[in-house]
Amino acid sequence: MKSTVEQLSPTRVRINVEVPFAELEPDFQRAYKELAKQVRLPGFRPGKAPAKLLEARIGREAMLDQIVNDALPSRYGQAVAESDVQPLGRPNIEVTKKEYGQDLQFTAEVDIRPKISLPDLSALTVSVDPIEIGEDDVDAELQSLRTRFGTLTAVDRPVAVGDVVSIDLSATVDGEDIPNAAAEGLSHEVGSGRLIAGLDDAVVGLSADESRVFTAKLAAGEHAGQEAQVTVTVRSVKERELPEPDDEFAQLASEFDSIDELRASLSDQVRQAKRAQQAEQIRNATIDALLEQVDVPLPESYVQAQFDSVLHSALSGLNHDEARFNELLVEQGSSRAAFDAEARTASEKDVKRQLLLDALADELQVQVGQDDLTERLVTTSRQYGIEPQQLFGYLQERNQLPTMFADVRRELAIRAAVEAATVTDSDGNTIDTSEFFGKRVSAGEAEEAEPADEGAARAASDEATT
């Protein structure tokens, strides 16, 4: 088999393939064997009919069509493997010559990962916000802790912000009751902003068994986005009593003996949280700095696939009713054209980031090991509250292991870029990033997830590189 590659653009190629007819002989033999099992010819046992008679029964051209259709995927894959292109998505294949006894010729046009010239990472400079911790931050954490240990006491007075109320809700649209919007005995903390927009303002000042009607847009269901008349009835009012922030509370809520020790611990927690936020800021700033210096050509089909995914997610809550989706956008002061423009811009940026990090991983020869996949499995399984083995099975069943593999590889690439760059805060202080991205899972967790990850490493790596 011979193949050549034509560069149609930085992101698209045409692969010209010529397959000698003799190389199709094994394909013919396999097809004849399968047909012999299916076609009954007088005088021959099942599976024993000669190829010539089968060909006469089916027709030479029909046989050739079947052989070519079956052979195209493997011959295309072979041509890709023999070239240095990295396809993105499905190819557009056109058979240009198909005659019995003659060489098979076809072309395959496909988008590819573009070649990207990367800058010197050691010359990269990144600046982010400094970490600042004030007493207000610690006070907020302490207040949250006091709330967790607070007690609720029934009170006979109108509702105030901070109270916890039991409420009934019902709604109508144009005078029609909406059954799915009705609920009884809901517990709600006034001022939290949860449940329905406008609810907090509506209940403030009401006493038990009093009602009020307010207007709100429904968030889900067949009336999603429509204005509804919502009736809220308060059934009970409870006041949250918070413990005093003293040494006794510190001993109740923590392992510390004094409130000062507890505040110091909360300050450390705030610092760790802000360090995590800073690490994410550094990561994004590093990618943005690279994108400013690098030209990343965009494969149109890849961008379109990303855009289609965004649109699919947006429509999923409306049963993929595009007409209703367009109406909802107008009601929100937007339009379908504006949504499409924003979604395409976001899709283009996302594709640029992916292609940049893939090129960076290639340049740095990033290798994804079992420990890297274990770390991702353990971290992700914690977020969902499931076991690593269970997550692995879920990903494997849905063929999402290659996606996880690619994500881990990109993350390792950006870690390497951050380590090579000079990172400072806006005050000019150099930031040590060595502790930001290098945390490994414990030996026990790794051992627990190890059987899954051996399979993950093999399956994901194999599929991601095909």
Curated annotation (Swiss-Prot):
GO biological process, one term: 'de novo' cotranslational protein folding
Subcellular location: Cytoplasm
Every PPIase FKBP-type domain range: 162-243
SUPFAM superfamilies: FKBP-like, Triger factor/SurA peptide-binding domain-like, Trigger factor ribosome-binding domain
Keywords assigned: Cell cycle, Cell division, Chaperone, Cytoplasm, Isomerase, Rotamase
Keyword set includes Transmembrane: no
Domain of life: Bacteria
Gene3D superfamilies: 3.10.50.40, Trigger factor ribosome-binding domain, Trigger factor, C-terminal domain
Top enzyme category: isomerase
Bias kind Low complexity: ranges: 457-466
Keyword Transferase: no
GO MF, one annotated term: ribosome binding
UniProt catalytic activity: [protein]-peptidylproline (omega=180) = [protein]-peptidylproline (omega=0)
A cellular-component GO term for this protein: cytoplasm
Enzyme nomenclature, EC number: 5.2.1.8
Chain positions covered by the region annotation Disordered: 428-466
Main location (coarse class): cytoplasm
PANTHER family: TRIGGER FACTOR CHAPERONE AND PEPTIDYL-PROLYL CIS/TRANS ISOMERASE (PTHR30560), TRIGGER FACTOR-LIKE PROTEIN TIG, CHLOROPLASTIC (PTHR30560:SF3)
Purpose: Involved in protein export. Acts as a chaperone by maintaining the newly synthesized protein in an open conformation. Functions as a peptidyl-prolyl cis-trans isomerase.
The family this protein is said to belong to: Belongs to the FKBP-type PPIase family. Tig subfamily.
Domain-related comment: Consists of 3 domains; the N-terminus binds the ribosome, the middle domain has PPIase activity, while the C-terminus has intrinsic chaperone activity on its own.
Name of protein: Trigger factor
Organism encoding this protein: Mycobacterium bovis (strain ATCC BAA-935 / AF2122/97)
Gene: tig
